[in-house]
Each structure stands twice: as C-alpha cells, then as structure tokens.
Amino acid sequence: NVAIGDEAGTAITTGDNNVAIGYTALDANTTGANNTAVGYASLGANTTGTPNTAVGRSALGANTTGGGNTAVGDLALGNNTTADGNTAVGRNSMNVNTEGHSNSALGDTALYRNTTGDSNTAVGFQALDHNTTADSNTAVGASALTANTTGATNVAVGDTALDANTTGSHNVALGVSALGANTTADDNVAVGRSALAAN
C-alpha cells in the first residue's frame, strides 16, 4: 500500500495494493484492496469495496462496499455507497447515485441525480441530469434527456434531444431538439433536427 497525505489510508489492516494520495483519502478502508484514491477525501468512507478508482475531491467519497467503480472529477459518484460497476467522469457526474449499477456518465453533472437507476449511459453536459430510478436510457449530447426522471429505455442523440421527457419510455430521438417537447408519451421515433419537436 502507498499512502501520502494526512490521515490517508489510516485504517487499512489487511487490504492490499491500495494507493491513497490526499488528505483523508481511503482513510476508513480496512480490507478493501486494489483501490486508487487521489484527492481530498476521495474514497474516504470506503471500508471493503474493491477495486475502485477515484480521482478528485470527494470522488467516491461515501463509497463503503461498492466495487468496480471509476470516478474522475470533483464529487464524481460522491454519494455512491454500495453500487458496483459505475463510471463517472466530470464534475458532479453521478453525484447523487447511491445504489445504481452499471451506469456510465461523461460530462459535467451527467446523470447527476441518479440514485438507483441501472444501465444508463449519459454523455454530455447535463445529459440525463434528473434521472433518478429509470433504467437503460442512452443520452448523447448536451441536455439530452435532461428532465427524464423515471422514463426507461429511451435513446436520445443530439443536443436537447428528448430534453423535456420525464416519464415517457421506449422513445428514440436522433437529432438536435428531436422530440424536444415530449414529456410522458411512449414509443415515438423522431429522426432529424427538431423532428416531432412539439409532440
């Protein structure tokens, strides 16, 4: 194990191959192994979770037993506790996530409010920002599916595509502002800039 910084890795007992750099980085870890924490309080609450990578202030800071997570950015996956297999890159990306598994978020506040939703992909500033419990959504583009809360299995590609959608499911929007006004309707397909924008 390698620990650099005040209180970094102070509780490690049998955990192996950990790297903790920064004040209180990995400071609660006991048996967790193969973790990398770089930044103030990164992976600070981790006890047995393995393997995780956290780079940034409080990245994966609340994680206790979750494993296979990667968080890069200020507060990325900051509230994750037990969830596995998430990747969050960007400031506040997936910050509220607690138990959602197998999600990928790339961009400032992407999937920010996700708590228990699984298998979502968000790429872009505020993509899927309000998603909480919904599963299997794909959003690519700034503010794509940004208002979505519980709508599932939607695909939005393009800036503000399906950006007003809240509970609608099984929609496909390809193009800037495609299906932009849709909120609760299901099973729509829109291809092209502003296609079905008023739907």
Predicted regions, residues:
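Glycine- and small/polar-enriched repetitive beta-structure motifs of secreted/surface proteins
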Residues: 1-199
